Structures are given as structure tokens and as C-alpha cells.
Amino acid sequence: MSLVSAALFGLVQALTEFLPVSSTAHLLVFGELLGHSLDDRRFRAFVTIIQAGTTLAVLIYFRADIARLVAASTRGLVRGKPLGTPEARLGWYILLGTLPAALAGKLLERRIEALGNWVIAGSLVGLGLVLLAAERLASHRRRVEDVGPGDALLIGVAQALALVPGSSRSGTTITGGMLLGFTREAAARFSFLLSVPITLAAGAYKLWSTVPDLRGEVAWTVATVVGTVVSAVAGYLVIDWLLAWLRTRTTYVFVVWRIAAGAAIAALILSGVLPAGAEAPPPPPPALHAAP
């Protein structure tokens, strides 16, 4: 893989991990167009590892929030009042919201990886329509501070649904938050914070299992480093842009994007460019993924 291609893959990962449009679907199409097959263990490792860049972007962007939540949760636990402050409650609610995806990922991983590209196309369109409904019907009034245990669990279930390729972790969780009445920005902010535990755990597992595939592959290793750095830097910028966008604008552009992408993948399958079978990249850590 050339360094230019690696940088482009990193950019695609960053853009589509955090926007509610599915990084899995876009990496699939982009890989096919550039002639990279996921039967190649090196390319599969590359796709997996560059997702660590977007995880790093979340950690850096929300470092102050994460530090505050961890400190408050730990302090409350030590003092025997784990839910004593808003920050402590939010920290524990994020862990609560992580459970559905963790359980679903453990139980359904092999079945999910067997899903084909028609599922990706259908997920893109289907969730696009649900996002449209959320945009039109939701109240958009609640803030992150208003998150309760029920909200965290329901948005966590939405995060688990992102294990289905083409759904988008950020897409399902932002949509879930909006349907519960949160503002667009609050839904996105909670979505990103919720991604931290699951993407760290799933990312560490996937890195451990795929890094050996690049052993002795100097060119691929360099390309992977480039792609990961690009995905981290671009991912940071995308997070900042998306939060600013959602403060004053709607998600309609992403509804159109999802439906168009789903239709494009369906057309590529029908034309024989993409196989109908399960040759998509593994979904981002639910992440997975946010992915973003």
C-alpha cells in the first residue's frame, strides 16, 4: 500500500467513524475501489489498527471530561457515595451503558462477521430513516447532565445495535439520544463519551490479535503508522466540527448521505463490483465503531 493510499484510508476512517454514516461501509467501498482485498491479512490488520487513531482522538478531545468523570466516580466510591455528584453519576452511567454492547459483542461476534454486504446497504438506509424520524419527532431539549440510568441503558442498547455492519456506532447512539429528547449536541457528546470504555477494550483485543499479521512487513507497517496518525489528527478535527455543526444545524445531511451510500452499495452489488457475501471489514469497536 502506498503512503498516499494509507493517508486516504485514515481520512476516510476519521470522517466516517464520528459522523453517523458508518465507517464499515465506507472502508468497504474505498478498499474495493483501490483494489485491496480483506482476504489479505495485512490489509485486514491495517483496517483494524487505524481505528485506534480515532479512539485516540476521542481520548485527547475529551481528556478533561474523562479525567473529571473518573476522578468524581473514584472519589464517590471511596467516600461511600458513588452517585453523590452529577459527574460521578454520569461516570457510572457510562459504564452501565457499555454493558449491552459488551455482552452482545461477546455472544454474537462470529455471527455478525458472517453478515453480507446486503446487510450493510440495508442498515445504511434503515438507520437513515430512523434518524430522519428522530430529527422530525424528538423534542431536542435535554442536556448531558439530564442523563439517567434508563437513558444510559437504552442508548447502550442502541450502541449494541451498531455491531450490525453499516449501522454506525455514532449513528445508532446519536439517534437513540435524540429519540430520548436530548439535543443533537448532547446526544453526540454522550455518544462519544460512551464510546470510550468499549472502544478501548475492543480495540486492545483486536490490536493484540492483528498486529502479528504485520510482523516483517516493513512497507505495510509504515503505511499503517501513517494511516493511524492521519485518522487521529483528522478524527480530532471531525469531532470538533460535528459538535459545532449540531449546535445550530440538523442531521438531515447525514440522512441523505446514509441513504445515498446504501443505494450506491446496492448498485455495486448488483453490478458485480462488490460481492453479496460477507467480505466487509470487521465493524469498528462499538465502536463500535466509534466510532465515531
Curated annotation (Swiss-Prot):
Note: Bacitracin is thought to be involved in the inhibition of peptidoglycan synthesis by sequestering undecaprenyl diphosphate, thereby reducing the pool of lipid carrier available.
GO molecular function: undecaprenyl-diphosphatase activity
Reaction catalyzed: di-trans,octa-cis-undecaprenyl diphosphate + H2O = di-trans,octa-cis-undecaprenyl phosphate + phosphate + H(+)
InterPro entries in the cross-refs: UppP
GO BP: any one term: response to antibiotic
Function recorded in the entry: Catalyzes the dephosphorylation of undecaprenyl diphosphate (UPP). Confers resistance to bacitracin.
Pfam families reported in the protein's UniProt record: BacA
The name this protein goes by in its record: Undecaprenyl-diphosphatase
Domain of life: Bacteria
Transmembrane segments: 1-21, 46-66, 88-108, 114-134, 192-212, 225-245, 253-273
Family according to the record: Belongs to the UppP family.
Localization terms from the record: Cell inner membrane
EC supergroup of this enzyme: hydrolase
Main location (coarse class): membrane
GO CC field: plasma membrane
Enzyme Commission numbers on file: 3.6.1.27
Membrane disposition: Multi-pass membrane protein
Native organism taxonomy: Bacteria, Pseudomonadati, Myxococcota, Myxococcia, Myxococcales
Keyword Transport: no
Keyword terms, alphabetized: Antibiotic resistance, Cell inner membrane, Cell membrane, Cell shape, Cell wall biogenesis/degradation, Hydrolase, Membrane, Peptidoglycan synthesis, Transmembrane, Transmembrane helix
